[in-house]
Each structure stands twice: as C-alpha cells, then as structure tokens.
Design a protein with these regions (language model features):
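Positively charged, amphipathic and often flexible ligand-engagement surfaces
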Residues: 1-217
Length: 217
C-alpha cells in the first residue's frame, strides 16, 4: 500500500525534510493488526519483534515522501503503543522527517497527558509529530471491559458531551505545543470544526475526514 500511494502521487524522491509531507497523502497502520499478541503481558516480545517492522514501514513511507500515522488502540494498549512509537520515532534513520504521526482519542481520559508526552518526545528528538485527534472508536468495548473486570471507573468518558469538551480541551493543548506538534482534526461535526477554527487563531493545522463523508463541510 505504501508503494502504491507513493507512486500514485509521484512523491518518490521528494525532500523528506520539507513540510511538503503535510500536503502529501498518508497511510495509517494498526499495530494490533501487525502482531498476534499485541498486549502488555508480551511487552518485551512486542518491542523486540514489532518495533523493527514498524520502523521499516516508517522508513519506507519516508522514502516515498508520504505521511505515516499509527492508529489508536484500546486504552489497555496505550502504554505499549507509546513505547513502540517512542522507540521507532527516535531512530536516527528518521532524522529530519516530520511524516511520522499518530492518532489520539479524545474520549480517553488520558488524552491531554498523551499530548504532553508526545510534545516532550518531539522536543527531545528535535522534530514535530503530526497528531490526528479523533473522538474514539472503541467505546462499547471499553465500557464492557471495565464492567467485566470490575474496574473502579471507566478509562473513557461515558457521556458524549464530556467527550466533546475533551476534544476541544485536547485541541487547545495541541496548539499550545505548536512548536512540537502538527495538529490534525478528524471530525465531521460542524460545531467542533468551527470551535477548532476559533481556537487555532490562524495557526496552521488541518481537518481530516473519512472518504466519502463530510464532503459538504
């Protein structure tokens, strides 16, 4: 898929260190789809076997001049995902390339802290991280797991309005870290889009949508 996307837009050979990567197409990968036991109990094996594959895909995306986004997972995999991202994003082979990003889910209560972690990582490594803010895709599973395991609380917000507020609060924090993060907002909600525009105050960012949806917006 990386080869196909890169060749379709003739991005091969483009300057990987330039900001043009933000205007280029991008590809998303799901870590749990690349490894059969993607769970914290297998952390050492995941880091040893999956991290090299994730890095290789990132290097391939860079060679084609396209973006590379790691999709969000369920909350119990968050720390593992951040470990993989930190290990691969920091690799010297990606120096000067700002195409390596990830998705953050606003319905997770830890979203603002994830943003702070990513900003710190970006500053330590010396290049920006594109961050796609989404509302979240695993609500039913997250709530069910918390109930089955008898957890004292839920890792996600259980009311839509709380998620909406979290989305805007997290968006504001992303802009606060504008030197370290490139904000990307994936939503089809017109009110949220208008609010993000107001928060941005002219600072650079982009809106994203699912193919075939939200065209009028």
């Amino acid at each position: 898929a990386i080869h196909a996307i890169g060749r379709s837009g003739n991005y091969v050979g483009s300057d990987p260190a330039s900001n043009s990567v933000f205007a280029a197409p991008s590809i998303s990968i799901k870590l749990s789809a690349l490894f059969p036991r993607y769970e914290h109990a297998k952390r050492e094996r995941v880091l040893a076997e999956l991290a090299p594959a994730v890095l290789e895909l990132a290097q391939l995306a860079r060679s084609h001049g396209i973006g590379y986004t790691v999709d969000a997972e369920e909350s119990d995999r968050l720390e593992l995902s951040l470990d993989i991202i930190e290990a691969t994003f920091s690799d010297p082979s990606l120096d000067g390339w700002e195409g390596y990003g990830l998705a953050v889910q606003a319905y997770q209560k830890r979203a603002p802290y994830v943003i702070d972690f990513l900003a710190d990582l970006a500053r330590r490594v010396g290049r920006r991280i594109p961050v796609r803010l989404v509302k979240g895709a695993y609500w039913d599973a997250e709530v069910k797991r918390a109930q089955v395991e008898g957890l004292p609380g839920y890792p996600v917000f259980t009311r839509k309005q709380n998620t909406d507020v979290s989305y805007l609060a997290t968006a504001r924090r992303m802009f606060d870290h504008g030197d370290a993060l490139y904000p990307m907002f994936a939503t089809h909600n017109a009110q949220t889009i208008a609010a993000v525009q107001a928060i941005a105050e002219g600072r650079p960012y982009e809106h994203q949508k699912l193919h075939g949806m939200g065209d009028d917006l």
